[in-house]
Regions:
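Transmembrane alpha-helices and adjacent helix-loop boundaries
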Residues: 1-216
Length: 216
């Protein structure tokens, strides 16, 4: 029991440091930075959260994927389409958030099924995710006024928040994602991901459904 508690403390201590330091940086960032820097960093914080997922897949599972930007775009465009063509309200915003996540998950599940459930190599997954980005771009460009084409979706109503508030939201999101990623890679599930990267065939011999784990 004492060894288990000590292990939990060793795992949670870095998470507490990440949250504390991150909260301080995010909290005081808009106070010491000019509005232009806050605007740029808000976008950068969101992109950093997406980059963390690339690190998990490539760094810990050995799968080079180009699809994170596509999944990000699918979720964002799902919400944007709802706001543009249906309208905006707090309840619609919640529905758009849920539908955006579900749409991205559905496409990711389809890509995972194509890439991992047919005995294909990780290179095949890289090619599929690269093609997905190209397909998403062409769909948006070909959608005309419905998708905004090359100009994107603009002019729809949203929450009337200051750039400082958006900075805090983006920073808080990155802190949560970073802490979650740390807990994942230092858990039993994280060790399984590393084992799949090192020797996937042996993991299958041990009864692990590696295709399901990689898709998840």
């Amino acid at each position: 029991m004492s060894e288990t508690l000590a292990q939990v403390r060793r795992t949670l201590r870095p998470v507490a440091i990440i949250v504390l330091v991150g909260a301080l940086l995010v909290g005081f960032g808009p106070v010491v930075l000019d509005s232009y820097s806050v605007n740029v960093l808000t976008r950068s914080l969101l992109y950093a959260a997406v980059a963390l997922t690339v690190d998990l897949l490539w760094g810990y599972m050995g799968i080079l994927t180009f699809g994170q930007s596509a999944f990000f775009a699918i979720g964002a465009y799902t919400s944007g389409l709802i706001f543009t063509h249906i309208g905006f309200s707090p309840w619609l915003a919640l529905a758009a958030l849920v539908l955006g996540v579900l749409a991205a998950m559905a496409v990711a599940a389809l890509v995972g099924w194509l890439a991992f459930w047919h005995g294909a190599t990780n290179l095949y997954a890289s090619v599929i995710t690269l093609v997905l980005c190209i397909v998403c771009t062409q769909v948006i460009f070909s959608g005309g006024n419905f998708t905004g084409s090359s100009s994107g979706l603009t002019g729809f109503d949203s929450f009337d928040l200051s750039m400082q508030a958006w900075f805090w939201i983006a920073g808080g999101f990155l802190i949560v994602v970073t802490a979650g990623a740390w807990l994942l890679v230092h858990s039993d599930a994280g060790r399984i991901l590393i084992a799949i990267r090192e020797n996937e065939q042996r993991c299958e011999y041990l009864g692990l459904n590696t295709a399901l784990l990689k898709t998840t």
